[in-house]
Amino acid sequence: MRDKKTSYIRLLHASPKAPAVDVYANGDNILADDLSYGEFTPYLPVMPGTYTIDIYPADNSDTPILTKELVLPEKTIATIAAIGELPELELFIVEDPKEPLQPNTSKIRFVHLSPDAPAVDVIEPNGSILFKDVSYKDITDYLSITPDTYTVEIAPTGTDNSVLFVPNIRLLPDAFYSLYAIGLVEGDPYLQLLIPLDGNSYIET
């Protein structure tokens, strides 16, 4: 049985061109082993408190590429993303808030983690704008939407110059999703959209 104060975190490697990494908390507690770009860990139960996070290249614990202190409140559900381009790596926290969800609906939001992309709009093929003028490191509010299969395009705000086309996004009922834009508009790895199920869909705190 979990402590009533338990929090839950997952890690996301969203730093373009960075190698696979190992992530440690408070010295020797490993949170992620050989986490590659674009990958998430499962949600991990952790106690609230202050943590020192060290990120190393996978299988090389000589010198961390990032050391950061992280304060985690109790009963939090969150994704902790490694973002930015080396050597300006940083940790970015995306909390999964508990909020009402009407039966047989889904909720989606957009998280802009592409370091060289301008502010963007997320658009449906019919021209309907789901999210508008979202800048790097912005997290939108959740939007209620009918469960279905969707196609979206991402374009610099105010233009129809699509930089990413994503078909066949299947949204199930009674669930929360985040659309994470990662990668680079100019260069490799190119811009892509990660669409995980958020922990607030099924984790009780």
What are these regions (language model features)?
Residues M1-T205:
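Intrinsically disordered, low-complexity polar regions and short flexible loop motifs
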